[in-house]
């Protein structure tokens, strides 16, 4: 979102995000939503210092400008809503909500595709790596039961995006959305 401050570089029609080596800053999309089912993919392109330094997720739209100096999954001072992220924070990969570790994720490697399905009607977010099973035994097709999902507040406006630190990520589709 160009109205938010960011130190990263966008290229290739804003589908590629290259991070600086000094900040865990995030980038939010210009698309916000409060309902519906949404699907996103992020291709992880490079390690930084031998570590995974990227994340993807969603944040309450009221908090997006606060998140710009942090990463998805962490809450920042003054935030009022939920922030969920799948973080490649160093040598581990975790699913986080508002600073809390919700589940351990699969460690991704260079060229892996990180996938996120968000069911805003039922308040559920799901993650997977490549075309493998959804993490935490999750099932985006479970609807209102939210099997294995990270739960979020229904009815809020959310924006989607990613975080990069000294590396590059691509945002284009490689796999299909859950049906």
Per-region residue spans from a language model:
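PRY/SPRY (B30.2) beta-sandwich protein-interaction domains
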Residues: 1-179
């Amino acid at each position: 979102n160009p109205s938010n401050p960011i130190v990263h570089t966008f290229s290739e029609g804003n589908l590629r995000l290259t991070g600086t080596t000094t900040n865990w800053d995030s980038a939010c999309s210009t698309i916000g939503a409060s309902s519906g089912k949404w699907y996103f993919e992020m291709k992880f392109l490079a390690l930084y210092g031998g570590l995974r330094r990227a994340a993807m997720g969603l944040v309450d739209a009221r908090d997006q400008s606060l998140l710009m100096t942090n990463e998805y999954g962490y809450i920042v001072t003054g935030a009022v809503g939920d922030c969920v992220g799948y973080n490649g924070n160093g040598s581990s990969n975790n699913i986080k909500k508002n600073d809390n570790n919700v589940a351990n994720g699969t460690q991704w490697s260079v060229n892996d595709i990180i996938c996120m399905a968000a069911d805003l009607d039922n308040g559920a977010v799901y993650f997977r790596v490549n075309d493998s099973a959804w993490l935490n035994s999750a099932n985006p097709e479970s609807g209102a039961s939210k099997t294995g999902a990270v739960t979020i507040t229904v009815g809020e406006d959310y924006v989607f995006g990613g975080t990069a630190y000294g590396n590059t990520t691509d945002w284009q589709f490689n796999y299909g959305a859950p049906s």
